[in-house]
From Swiss-Prot:
Protein name in the entry: Conotoxin ArMKLT2-0112
Compartments in which it is found: Secreted
Modified residues (Pyrrolidone carboxylic acid): 41
Molecular function GO terms recorded: ion channel inhibitor activity; toxin activity
Length: 70
């Protein structure tokens, strides 16, 4: 009985390790996508923006849709 429990736990542990390894491969691809987003050029002051992280200055006034200096 104890041996059966140990074997079941070992199989579950190994299965979990394989699933984790499989997720890491996908995570590496997502990381590459994130890095490509980080290498995009930012919008200069006065340019159009919809989010603060689009602007080189990191400041966007959404009401007018323009990047501003901070």
């Amino acid at each position: 009985m104890k041996l059966t429990c140990v074997l079941i736990i070992a199989v579950l542990f190994l299965t979990a390790c394989q699933l984790t390894t499989g997720e890491q491969k996908d995570h590496a691809l997502r990381s590459t996508d994130k890095n490509s987003k980080l290498t995009r050029q930012c919008t200069p002051v006065g340019g159009y923006c919809s989010r603060h992280y689009h602007c080189c200055s990191n400041h966007c006034i959404k009401s007018i849709g323009r990047c501003v200096a901070h």
